[in-house]
């Protein structure tokens, strides 16, 4: 499967809640995104022109969503249910859409300009 899905590691849990952590080499602007239940985002792919979209690196920090994807070269496709907290890496040339099952919050580890320069719809 070309999509990489990994839980976000738990550092500590106590009566206040949980502390999770992740590491990244990326710097600069990131996107904090809120989507309402029932909405669909994405419906595009990236060619890998932008470093920030090769791969697309996203952290679902709240909620539940379905990620539908299709490899444009092999034609392999699937739908994965994502339950926060989880990290998803989507390589270039993978068409994808994200359907919010509940209200969701996610962080994209790229800037808005990186995304717009390397986003293509079919």
Region roles according to the model:
Residues 1-4, 13, 97-122:
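Double-stranded beta-helix
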Residues 20-23, 42-52, 69, 78-80, ...:
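Short histidine-centered beta-strand/loop micro-motifs
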């Amino acid at each position: 499967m070309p999509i990489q899905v990994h839980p976000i590691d738990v550092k500590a849990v106590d009566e206040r809640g949980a502390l999770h952590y992740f590491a990244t080499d990326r710097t600069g602007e990131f996107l904090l995104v809120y989507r309402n239940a029932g909405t669909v985002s994405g419906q595009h792919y990236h060619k890998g022109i932008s470093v920030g979209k090769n791969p697309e690196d996203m952290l679902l920090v709240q909620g539940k969503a379905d990620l539908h994807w299709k490899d444009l070269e092999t034609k392999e496709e699937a739908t994965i249910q994502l339950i926060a907290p989880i990290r998803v890496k989507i390589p270039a040339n993978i068409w994808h859409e994200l359907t919010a099952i509940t209200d969701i919050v996610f962080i994209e580890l790229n800037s808005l300009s990186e995304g717009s320069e390397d986003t293509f719809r079919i």
